Every structure is written in C-alpha cells, then in structure tokens.
Swiss-Prot record:
Protein name: E3 ubiquitin-protein ligase RNF187
InterPro entries: TRIM/RBCC (IPR050143), Znf_RING (IPR001841), Znf_RING/FYVE/PHD (IPR013083), Znf_RING_CS (IPR017907)
GO molecular-function term, one example from the UniProt record: ubiquitin-protein transferase activity
Sequence positions bearing Asymmetric dimethylarginine: 98, 109
Protein's UniProt keywords contain Disulfide bond: no
Organism, scientific name: Mus musculus (Mouse)
C-alpha cells in the first residue's frame, strides 16, 4: 500500500533515493512504487521482496501460500532427509548453483561436503538478468550508431570519388588539346623554316648574321607563345 514520505534516512532499496509514492513490504523494506512495478514488469510470479526475497507480497496474491517461516522449516526438514536424490518439493528448490545454474535444494547443499557449491537466490539471478538485458540494449544501440556512421562514410567516399574522376577527365582532355597544339605549331615552324631556307638559297648575298638573328627571334616568339598557351590551359 502507498505510504506517506518517511524519515530522511528511509530510501528505496532499488534506486537508493528517497521513495516516490513509497510502498513498504511486510518485511520492512521500502521502495518507490515505480521501481517495484518496473522490477517485476516482465514476471508472472513469484513476487518476493526485491531486497530480502521474503514472500510477503506473494501471500497477498496467493493467500493460501505458506509464510516464509513455514517454508524455512520445510527446507530444514528436506536438509535432514536421508535421501539426497529423492524428489524435492518446489518450496525446497529456492537456490541456484553458480557452477551449472540448476536448482539446488537444501539437502543437496548440506550433503555437498566440507566445500559446498556456491549458490545464490533465484531473485538475485533475475535481477542480474535484467541488468544484462540493459547492457545488451546499450550495445545494440552502439552497433546501430556505428553502422549509420559507416554508411555516411561510404556515401562521402563515393562523392569524393566522383569529383576525382571528373578532374581526371578534364586534365586528360586538356593534355590532349595541348599536345595537338604543339604538333600543329611544330608543323607550322617546319614550314616556315623550309620557306626561310628556300629564300636563303635565292638570296646568297644576304648577310648570314642577319638571317641568324631573324631565325632566333622567330624561335623566341614561338617559345613565348607556347608558354603562354600552356599556362592559360593549366589555370582553367
């Protein structure tokens, strides 16, 4: 049942904070109503106290269920029974072996020798299972985020690959144009040289120094023209 806010030192045994809409089990432990509902949200029963595993709340939904004291007495009687492998009642199987996870009755635990197997209450294992489930959900979310980032990286790589291919095609086209221009200018230069050579044969009295200076000037103008054209094409 719901209780008013208790003293300052009364905290919820699950969230370790002051209880909100506090409820109290008959064993004395206090909890937030939301914490208890969330703790047993996926369980059909039994409903022991989340802190001490007392079955006071289970008796509220099962009035015919024997109290914890009588169940402990049944465990003691089972422990004193001589037959270890005999059929055990459901009330006696309240422990789980840490080694293999099978139910462990008190008779088996007492007959295990000087070093009995480690055991834990079932409700502790249920709580650990809920914690593991939360960890799995976090790992699944991180995995989905990593997949999204991987997809974004692949998309960006595809875009940059397209840009690189476009620049490569443009550079190849400019190179072909420049090469064709050089071939054309080379043919034009050879034709001019042949004309100058024919003119020099007709004019044997011309000064060789003048003809050399004229040829050198033509070569300089051609080199300057080629250089300017190459720079203009590279800067496009």
């Amino acid at each position: 049942m719901a209780l008013p806010a208790g003293p300052a030192d009364a905290i919820c045994a699950l969230c370790q904070r002051a209880p909100r809409e506090p409820v109290r089990a008959d064993c004395g432990h206090r909890f937030c109503r939301a914490c208890v509902v969330r703790f047993w949200a996926e369980e059909d029963g039994p409903f022991p106290c989340p802190e001490c595993a007392d079955d006071c709340w289970q008796r509220a939904v099962e009035p015919s269920r024997p109290p914890l004291s009588r169940r402990l007495l049944a465990l003691e009687e089972a422990a004193a029974a001589p037959a270890r492998d005999g059929p055990a009642s459901e009330a006696a199987l309240q422990l789980l072996c840490r080694a293999d996870g099978d139910p462990l009755c008190s008779a088996c635990r007492m007959a295990a020798g000087p070093e009995p197997p480690e055991w834990e209450p079932r409700w502790r294992k249920a709580l650990r299972g809920k914690e593991n489930k939360g960890s799995v959900e976090i790992m699944r979310k991180d995995l989905n985020d990593a997949r999204d980032l991987h997809g974004q990286a692949e998309s960006a790589a595809a875009v940059w690959k397209g840009h690189v291919m476009d620049r490569r095609k443009k550079a190849l086209t400019d190179y072909k144009k420049l090469r064709a221009f050089f071939v054309e200018e080379e043919e034009h230069f050879l034709q001019e040289a042949e004309k100058d050579e024919g003119a020099s044969e007709d004019d044997e009295l011309a000064d060789p120094a003048d003809r050399f200076r004229s040829l050198l000037q033509a070569v300089s103008e051609l080199e300057k023209k080629h250089r300017n054209l190459g720079l203009s094409m590279l800067l496009q």
